[in-house]
Amino acid sequence: MANFSESKSMMAVFFMFFLLLLSSSSSSSSSSPILKKIFIESPSYAPNAFTFDSTDKGFYTSVQDGRVIKYEGPNSGFTDFAYASPFWNKAFCENSTDPEKRPLCGRTYDISYDYKNSQMYIVDGHYHLCVVGKEGGYATQLATSVQGVPFKWLYAVTVDQRTGIVYFTDVSSIHDDSPEGVEEIMNTSDRTGRLMKYDPSTKETTLLLKELHVPGGAEISADGSFVVVAEFLSNRIVKYWLEGPKKGSAEFLVTIPNPGNIKRNSDGHFWVSSSEELDGGQHGRVVSRGIKFDGFGNILQVIPLPPPYEGEHFEQIQEHDGLLYIGSLFHSSVGILVYDDHDNKGNSYVSS
């Protein structure tokens, strides 16, 4: 387990200077135009996270009422796939946006597909770390605490496709995802977040990092040598080493304004949602960007989000087959951006 000091404020100044350079650059490698916006209406509110199975026929997303749903094309639309809560029922939970119902219905914040074993890992704010098979249904709960400290608000999850080991974050060890909990996290600048791993072969959960500053994202590298973790309130990404001479240690990687969830693309690079808070924090102005960076901390691309995501917090930006999937807590549709000249024939299930 590792701890580390905060980065220098000059890194934030450098980042903002770098953004100005990107915005004025004509290089397509740093700033690609949005060619098309696609919106797929969800049967429930706030589709915020995505994953894809090995068939590559559609996608999965988690929604506000506690479900994980699957989209299989414009003809089939969405179908229910999984529930983290064993108590989820249609009459009480379906399409609910009431936070008071989350303890019963659940609220999934991230999902990650294990291709080798054809199963999906789920992190839920109330039912914690779960797994469900390829047929879906009610998920099996795997872990609820680490070192005797219960999880309060699991938020990000990723699977090492080589080993099957699961890495996930807890936003806070004290406060949950209730409106009151969120307010306390922000007001106290909570630093009790954690990074954990779960080994399905031993069924053991291990604490890797603690005292994180609202860790809203985590993703493993393509070679499995490190995990990158986003600290929302520290405006930074840190790298935790899993292999090599630095194994078990963490280090500052790159400054990102208010980073959210992180997802790796097929090139081994990382996309992170950035909802930069201006004018006094969460009730002020927000600058919404998708930012791509590499494992060395180099910023490769910055994409200002178009309406309706412009100027608001968003949860996730994930690249798949040349499309960018946008996860948000404030809309009832899945936003998909075509941002370059990739051939998207493999994604014919997406209706345009």
From Swiss-Prot:
It comes from the Eukaryota. Pathway: Alkaloid biosynthesis; 3alpha(S)-strictosidine biosynthesis; 3alpha(S)-strictosidine from secologanin and tryptamine: step 1/1. InterPro entries: 6-blade_b-propeller_TolB-like, Strictosidine_synth_cons-reg. The keyword DNA-binding does not apply. The keyword Metal-binding does not apply. Residues 1-31 form the signal peptide. Its EC number is 3.5.99.13. Belongs to the strictosidine synthase family. This is Strictosidine synthase. Monomer. It catalyses: 3alpha(S)-strictosidine + H2O = secologanin + tryptamine. It is found in: Vacuole. The gene is STR1. Glycans are attached at residues 95, 187. GO terms for cellular component: endomembrane system; vacuole. GO terms for biological process: alkaloid metabolic process. Catalyzes the stereospecific condensation of tryptamine with secologanin to form strictosidine, the key intermediate of indole alkaloid biosynthesis. It is an enzyme of class 3 (hydrolase).
